[in-house]
């Protein structure tokens, strides 16, 4: 049984909320904020990821959460998301569906992919 929590009560209260916030930050071009929803803590790795976003000019056009599965112990989750994005390789949006793995870190869901 899954309990549904009000989204207004707590930021990133569910894995889907974290993924939604991540993609909204990407849509806004706020790559640093997007990376704050991941479990990357190494500053060098964060800088590498930021450069990748900027170099390839990755822009999320649209996204949709398709499903969410939380492990029995409540420490891991998988969120399936369909997104369309453009990059420096193509201005035509490319659609893809991906399963993002999440882990709970200090009570917050973080993308671990």
Report the location of each language-model feature:
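Exposed beta-sheet edge and beta->alpha loop/turn motif
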Residues: 70-113
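Short, conserved catalytic or interaction motifs in soluble domains
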Residues: 12
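Short solvent-exposed beta->alpha transition segments
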Residues: 17, 26-78
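C-terminal motif of bacterial Sec signal peptides marking the signal peptidase cleavage site
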Residues: 6-9
């Amino acid at each position: 049984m899954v309990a549904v929590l009000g989204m207004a009560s707590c930021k990133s209260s569910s894995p889907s909320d974290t993924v939604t916030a991540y993609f909204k930050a990407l849509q806004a071009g706020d790559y640093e904020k997007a990376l704050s929803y991941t479990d990357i803590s190494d500053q060098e790795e964060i800088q590498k990821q930021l450069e990748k976003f900027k170099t390839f000019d990755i822009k999320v056009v649209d996204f949709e959460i398709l499903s969410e599965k939380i492990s029995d112990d409540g420490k891991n989750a998988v969120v399936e998301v369909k997104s369309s994005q453009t990059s420096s390789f193509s201005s035509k949006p490319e659609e893809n569906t991906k399963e993002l793995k999440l882990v709970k870190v200090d009570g917050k869901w973080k993308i671990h992919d």
